């Protein structure tokens, strides 16, 4: 990621978090020529697996690495559980028992019909003459692969009826998600998460423009080791022309920061001319107060000392964020719309009295919180860290771009929406308006009398205040372009 000097300069121009950033560090050695600091991503489609490598580069070396991955075969995307078996699914007999595949697959709004072969073994999905597996396999451009990845991550591919209505069947999970059971880690077996953790650790400190990463030394056992290394190298060098930035959704010093309790991700894909080809924006749904909220059933699992009550709402007193324990207290006055304040002396230190400011203080911490939320690594726990219930909504959503997330939903037809969500509608407008922009130019966000925001001369069509924020975040992401 970019040096703290650059980060401080950029934050003075637009934004980036809300707390102090600590001491400025001086690189101990000259960064590799041509390798720019920043956070970059790269995608690859190999053997029916869509992989995303996110690489933080600082002082010319890998500072952190994060991998995500989905299976993307059409039949896998349409897989249902035995408990979901009905007239809406095919039953396929196999060596280890029956498996179930939805008869229709809604692929981001397009409905593909499944056909079971004569042997009753294979389902082929088509829309007209378009075979879904062939369509997926033909994707090669980074922005195309990214679009598929984010569509999967946000649950817009699902088993449906012939009209495309969601049947509530199993949805494909990111292998990095806490909910994923793909190749589980167990005694003597690293599994997918264990292997990628080894690879991520082995990448740290490497200058991938010249250093090699040894599989044996890494401790990883996966046969796909080199695939991950090659993808990480592509992101490191900036060959993918794709960057990503994380931050609290706010602009420093602005009077109105209505989403300042949310953490945003903005991923940009560029053409050779460095103009934006595609943008993907998402943000977490509020902060720890929402994550700590207990259902009646969950509340019964905690003692009175392990709960907090505000008015008639009951919350877990303790939350685990990516394994770190945070303890809450009721605030006399809500802070950034948060009724509870959470802290952990070991990680927040005396400098931060509230974990919202802590996670908002650096790009790296905002990044870690966003990933914890998206991958369901935030949990309601006992004081000793024992997990009692997940810290996501009952429908397992944690971010606003996800299909079933209910943030700013309008269902009465009174306004234009995307998936009944005014937030998704506004964000789609902002993402579209960013396409074609050259952020090396001095482009300002301005709001007209009709409340619609423009980026320079481009009208976004969006009215949400945060449109201005996302242009500021896009400028930071642009600065990471190698």
Q: Could you tell me what each predicted segment is?
A:
Residues 1-5:
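Positively charged n-region of N-terminal signal peptides that target proteins for export
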Residues 6-13:
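Sec-dependent N-terminal signal peptides
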Residues 15-17:
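C-terminal motif of bacterial Sec signal peptides marking the signal peptidase cleavage site
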Residues 19-27:
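Bacterial lipoprotein signal-peptidase II cleavage site
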Residues 31-32:
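Non-catalytic terminal and connector segments of soluble metabolic enzymes
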Residues 35-37, 43-248, 253-482:
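Active-site- and interface-proximal helix/loop "cap" or "latch" segments in soluble metabolic
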């Amino acid at each position: 990621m970019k040096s703290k000097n650059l980060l401080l300069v950029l934050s003075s121009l637009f934004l980036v978090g809300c707390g102090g950033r600590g001491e400025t560090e001086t690189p101990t050695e000259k960064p590799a020529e041509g390798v720019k600091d920043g956070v970059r991503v790269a995608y690859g489609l190999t053997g029916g697996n869509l992989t995303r490598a996110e690489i933080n580069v600082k002082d010319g070396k890998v500072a952190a690495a994060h991998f995500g991955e989905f299976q993307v075969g059409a039949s896998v995307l349409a897989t249902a559980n035995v408990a979901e078996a009905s007239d809406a699914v095919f039953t396929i007999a196999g060596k280890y028992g029956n498996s179930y595949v939805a008869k229709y697959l809604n692929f981001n709004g397009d409905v593909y019909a499944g056909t079971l072969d004569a042997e009753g073994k294979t389902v082929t999905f088509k829309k007209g003459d378009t075979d879904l597996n062939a369509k997926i396999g033909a994707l090669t451009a980074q922005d195309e692969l990214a679009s598929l990845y984010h569509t999967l991550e946000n649950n817009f591919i699902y088993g449906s009826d012939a009209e495309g209505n969601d049947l509530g069947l199993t949805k494909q999970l990111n292998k990095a998600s806490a909910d994923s059971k793909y190749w589980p880690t167990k005694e003597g077996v690293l599994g997918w998460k264990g292997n990628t953790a080894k690879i991520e650790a082995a990448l740290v400190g490497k200058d991938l423009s010249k250093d090699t990463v040894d599989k044996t030394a890494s401790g990883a056992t996966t046969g796909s080791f080199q695939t991950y290394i090659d993808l990480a190298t592509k992101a490191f060098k900036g060959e993918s022309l794709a960057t990503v930035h994380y931050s609290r959704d706010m602009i420093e010093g602005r009077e109105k920061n209505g989403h300042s309790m949310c953490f945003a991700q903005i991923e940009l894909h560029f053409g050779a001319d460095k103009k934006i080809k595609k943008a993907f924006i998402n943000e977490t749904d509020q902060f720890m107060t929402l994550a700590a909220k207990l259902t009646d059933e969950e509340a019964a699992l905690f003692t009175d000392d392990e709960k907090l009550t505000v008015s008639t709402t009951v919350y877990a007193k303790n939350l685990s964020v990516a394994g770190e324990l945070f303890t809450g207290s009721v605030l006399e006055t809500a802070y950034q719309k948060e009724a509870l304040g959470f802290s952990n002396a070991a990680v927040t230190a005396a400098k931060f009295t509230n974990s919202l400011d802590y996670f908002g203080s650096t790009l790296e911490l905002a990044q870690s919180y966003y990933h914890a939320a998206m991958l369901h690594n935030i949990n309601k726990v006992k004081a000793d860290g024992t997990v009692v219930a997940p810290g996501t909504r009952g429908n397992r959503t944690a971010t606003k771009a996800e299909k079933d997330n209910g943030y700013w939903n309008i269902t009465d037809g009174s306004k234009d929406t995307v998936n009944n969500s005014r937030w998704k509608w506004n964000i789609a407008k902002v993402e579209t308006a960013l396409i074609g922009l050259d952020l090396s130019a001095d482009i300002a966000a301005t709001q007209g009398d009709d409340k619609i925001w423009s980026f320079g001369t481009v009208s976004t069509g969006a009215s949400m205040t945060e449109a201005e924020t996302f242009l500021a975040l896009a400028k930071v992401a642009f600065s990471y372009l190698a």
